[in-house]
């Protein structure tokens, strides 16, 4: 058995971001007013960690079989605009737009003990155990950036910068490969373009693919049942070794304008839908054959997902 956590961003400038907790098909807890834009969540040991972007907070909750123990612990990030995170060796590394860095939170003391400066606005962050890999999504002037930076954890320094094409967004470690979803815009933001890149983390070789006009992708990238999926045309579709989207394997067919987020575990795929950015919204849960299993009713703009296995 497991608990499923879904973070709902809420509306920018208000504090109605929330976290919904489900066991099986049932909602067992809804934590309202977590803050202003609940950006990302992750499970580490018996804790759920949430980044609240526009409240500039990290919230840490103890997980029990009954859900999250309240009120949890709050850590201020000092107006940094925190975004995404990864845990390595009991330290939380999280990206920040305003301060253009990766801050390091000690998960024993809850003290932010250091920061690693990067060049641009960092978004997704993953770890291979020895190095952090960080997607630089935008330059300081909000134009599309083009790099992924490899940072040695021990020395806290950038050891290599990989050019991967415009708008790197989400990262996914898949054995020796790092997948990069990309989204970028023309100069006046009237057109959106999509691509996928892949870094061979052993050889350093980079593959880059741009998708043609008319493909509607999102940035979400995850692995389920041995395949890497990306949001595509109102659902999710697998990517092949040449980085092409395989439309025949698509799961879900929702209005592509309303598909807000997607994620997956080994057996389940979550598709978060909003039509008006107001609560209630819906997460559709599919199995990896593509069949719809059930629907979760959640708060405004479901954005991220995490699972805790009940021991």
Residue ranges and their predicted role:
Residues 1-311:
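Predominantly soluble domains enriched in secretory-pathway, periplasmic, or organellar proteins
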């Amino acid at each position: 058995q497991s608990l499923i956590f879904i973070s709902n961003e809420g509306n920018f400038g208000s504090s109605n971001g929330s976290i919904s907790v489900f066991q099986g098909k049932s909602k067992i807890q809804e934590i309202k007013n977590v803050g202003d834009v609940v950006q990302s969540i992750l499970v580490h040991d018996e804790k759920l960690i949430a980044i609240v972007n526009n409240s500039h907070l990290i919230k840490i909750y103890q997980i029990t079989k009954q859900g999250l123990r309240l009120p949890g612990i709050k850590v201020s990030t000092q107006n940094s605009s925190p975004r995404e995170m990864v845990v390595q060796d009991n330290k939380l590394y999280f990206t920040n737009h305003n301060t253009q860095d990766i801050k390091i939170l000690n998960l024993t003391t809850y003290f932010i003990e250091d920061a690693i400066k990067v060049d641009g606005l960092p978004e997704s962050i993953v770890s291979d155990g020895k190095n952090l890999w960080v997607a630089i999504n935008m330059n300081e002037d909000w134009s599309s950036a083009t790099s992924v930076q490899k940072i040695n954890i021990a020395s806290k320094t950038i050891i290599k910068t990989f050019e991967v094409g415009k708008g790197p967004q989400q990262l996914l470690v898949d054995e020796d490969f790092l997948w990069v979803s990309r989204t970028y815009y023309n100069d006046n933001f009237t057109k959106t373009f999509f691509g996928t890149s892949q870094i061979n983390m052993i050889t350093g070789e980079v593959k880059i693919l741009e998708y043609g006009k008319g493909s509607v992708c999102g940035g979400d990238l995850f692995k389920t049942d041995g395949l890497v999926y990306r949001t595509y045309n109102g659902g999710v579709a697998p990517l092949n070794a040449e980085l092409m989207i395989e439309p025949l394997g698509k799961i879900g067919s929702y209005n592509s304008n309303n598909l807000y987020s997607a994620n997956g575990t080994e057996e389940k795929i979550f598709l978060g839908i909003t039509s008006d950015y107001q609560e209630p919204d819906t997460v559709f849960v599919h199995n990896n054959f593509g069949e719809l299993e059930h629907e979760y009713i959640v708060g405004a703009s479901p954005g991220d997902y995490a699972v805790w296995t009940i021991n």
